[in-house]
Each structure stands twice: as structure tokens, then as C-alpha cells.
């Protein structure tokens, strides 16, 4: 069995991903002020369709 370290994958030490994070504020369950975002089914559906 060959482990990932033996295959010589690049970027071993710096595991930061490029680009924006996938989680957007529009689809978060809580707002920045701590209040709960309503309509969770609509929020989850919209998050999956983006």
C-alpha cells in the first residue's frame, strides 16, 4: 500500500486553498450580529443551487 506522502504530492507544507471560501454569508445559519437567519429550508435549497 502506498501512502500519499510517498507519491510526492505538491504543496505538502502550505495547505491553504486558493480562491474564496465556499460558505457565503447569505447561506449562513446565523447573521454577524448573532441573530438567527430564518427560513432554513429555503436557505439550504439556495445554497445547493449556486
From Swiss-Prot:
Keywords noted in UniProt: Sporulation
Pfam families membership: SspK (PF08176)
Induction and repression of expression: Expressed only in the forespore compartment of sporulating cells.
Comp. bias (Basic and acidic residues): 17-33, 40-50
Entry coiled-coil feature ranges: none
Any one Gene Ontology cellular component term annotated for this protein: endospore-forming forespore
HAMAP family cross-referenced by the UniProt entry: SspK
Name of protein: Small, acid-soluble spore protein K
Gene name for this UniProt entry: sspK
Amino acid at each position: 500500500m502506498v501512502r500519499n506522502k510517498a507519491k510526492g504530492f505538491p504543496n505538502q507544507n502550505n495547505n491553504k486553498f486558493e480562491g474564496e471560501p465556499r460558505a457565503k454569508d447569505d447561506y449562513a445559519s446565523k447573521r454577524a450580529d448573532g441573530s438567527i437567519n430564518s427560513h432554513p429550508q429555503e436557505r439550504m435549497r439556495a445554497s445547493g443551487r449556486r
